[in-house]
Amino acid sequence: MKGGIADSWQREKLATMESPEEPGASMDENYFVNYTFKDRSHSGRVAQGIMKLCLEEELFADVTISVEGREFQLHRLVLSAQSCFFRSMFTSNLKEAHNRVIVLQDVSESVFQLLVDYIYHGTVKLRADELQEIYEVSDMYQLTSLFEECSRFLARTVQVGNCLQVMWLADRHSDPELYTAAKHCAKTHLAQLQSTEEFLHLPHHLLTDIISDGVPCSQNPTEAIEAWINFNKEEREAFAESLRTSLKEIGENVHIYLIGKESSRTHSLAVSLHCAEDDSISVSGQNSLCHQITAACKHGGDLYVVGGSIPRRMWKCNNATVDWEWCAPLPRDRLQHTLVSVPGKDAIYSLGGKTLQDTLSNAVIYYRVGDNVWTETTQLEVAVSGAAGANLNGIIYLLGGEENDLDFFTKPSRLIQCFDTETDKCHVKPYVLPFAGRMHAAVHKDLVFIVAEGDSLVCYNPLLDSFTRLCLPEAWSSAPSLWKIASCNGSIYVFRDRYKKGDANTYKLDPATSAVTVTRGIKVLLTNLQFVLA
C-alpha cells in the first residue's frame, strides 16, 4: 500500500514538472529543472592563470622586444590587450607583424622595463627623474591610464625649475590640464624665469599664451618680453609689436578672505589678504558685516555670505567696488550649512545644515550666479551639519561635521559624501576620515588638504583613496585649536582660529616640496576666525 501511494505521488510530481508552464507562472517553479550558473570570479581567475603562465613559468612567449641590446621575452596577446600601438603593429601588414624579434629605438631600456611591469602587473613605480620620459612613451604606446597618471603626477609637482619644460611637453602631447598647471606656474614666476635658458629658447606661441593669460604686474612681464626678443633680436624683432599687444597685466588681487569677529563686537568682519611670493602676507582691506554669518564662500573674485537675523539672506562683496550687494535669499532658513563654489557651472551649492528647530538637514540647493536664482536638487545620503566642503572637478566632497546616531542624537561624523554636480547624485565613500567632527578643507590640483583640531594636516587623494598625514609645527600643537586652511598661489596656508588681538600667525606649506615657512605678525583685528576663503 505504501509503495502504491509513493508511486502515485511520484507520477503526479513528474507530470507537474513536465507540464507546460502556465502564463504568469514564476520561473522559480522550474529552478530544479534548469538554470544558468554564472561564475563571477571566472574572468579574474582566467586573467590570473594567464599571467602566471606568462610570468612565473615563462611559457608561450611569441615575440622578443629588443631595447638598447636587452631582449624582453613577451606575448603578443598581452601587449595587444593593453596597448593599441602594439595591437596595430601585430595586426598590420608591416614586417613587425611577422618578425620574431622587434627592435624599439625610441625608448630607454629602464623605462621600457617599467612599461612591461605596468602591462603585465598593473603597477609601476614612478620616479621623478624618469617621469617625463614615461609620460612621453606611455602616450606613444597608447597606454592611456598610465599616461593620465603621469600627467596628474607632473601637474602636482610642477614648479619654477621645470614649469616651462612641462608646458612645452604638455603642448606637444595635447594635454590641456597639465598645460594649464604649468602655464599658471610660469606666469606667476615670470620674473624668476626670464633669464633662464628654457625661457630664452621658449617658442613664440608659448610665450604669447603665457603673457596673454594675465600676468601679475609684479612679475615685470614687459621686461621679460624684452629679454626674450634681445636673445635673438634679428629673428624675434618682428614679434615685438604682437607680443606687446597680447600682454595682459593684472593687479595684485585679493587672495584670501578671513571672516571672523573682534573680541568686543558681536558681528563679523571680512578681512582681505594679499599673499606675496616672498611669503609676506599683507592686509589689503576690510569690510564690516553688520550680521551674524552662518556660511560663506568665494566665487571668482567675489565673496558670498549667508546669515542675518533671518538666516537665509545672502550678500555679495564685489571685489572690484568693495561694496556689499543683495542676492536672492535661500528658499528656507538654514544654519551651519556648507557653501561650495562650482566655477564650471557658475553656481554656488548649499549642502546640509540645520533647521531652526535644530534638526539636521540633507537638502542640497544651488544658486545660479548669472540668473540670481536658487534651485532645489536631490538630497545627500546622510544629513550633516558643519561639514567641510571642497569642489574637485565638479564633484563636491563633503567631509565630517555632525550626523545623527541610531538614537537620533548628533555625533561627530567621519563620513565622506560625494555629490556629483553633473548628475545630481550623491554617494558615501566606503571608507572614513582619519578623524571626526568639524574640520576645514582646501583643494590643491587633484588633492584635498584637510585640517581639524589636533596636530595634523591630512592630504586626501580621492583618485587613490589614500590619506597622508603631515605634522604641524610643535608650537602649534601645544594649544589645541580648530584651524582653517586655504589654497592660494600653489601653496597651502593654515590659520589658527584664535589669536591675540592684532597679531596673527600662519604657516605656508609648499605641496611639491613639503617645505614649511611661518609668517608672523599679520596685523588684523580678528580674534576668532569663522571662515578662511581663497
UniProtKB/Swiss-Prot annotation:
Kelch repeats (start-end): 255-301, 302-344, 347-394, 396-446, 448-497
Signal keyword on record: no
UniProt keyword terms in alphabetical order: Kelch repeat, Repeat
4Fe-4S keyword on record: no
Residue span, BACK domain: 163-255
Coiled-coil stretches: none
CDD domains in the record: BACK_KBTBD4, BTB_POZ_KBTBD4
Gene3D superfamilies: 1.25.40.420, Kelch-type beta propeller (2.120.10.80), Potassium Channel Kv1.1, Chain A (3.30.710.10)
UniProt cross-references to InterPro entries, sorted A to Z: BACK, BTB-kelch_protein, BTB/POZ_dom, KBTBD4, KBTBD4_BACK, KBTBD4_BTB_POZ, Kelch-typ_b-propeller, Kelch_2
Description of how the protein assembles with itself and partners: Component of the BCR(KBTBD4) E3 ubiquitin ligase complex, at least composed of CUL3, KBTBD4 and RBX1.
Protein task: Substrate-specific adapter of a BCR (BTB-CUL3-RBX1) E3 ubiquitin ligase complex which targets CoREST corepressor complex components RCOR1, KDM1A/LSD1 and HDAC2 for proteasomal degradation. RCOR1 is likely to be the primary target while degradation of KDM1A and HDAC2 is likely due to their association with RCOR1. Also targets RCOR3, MIER2 and MIER3 for proteasomal degradation as well as associated proteins ZNF217 and RREB1. Degradation is dependent on the presence of an ELM2 domain in the target proteins.
Protein name: Kelch repeat and BTB domain-containing protein 4
Native source organism of the sequence: Mus musculus
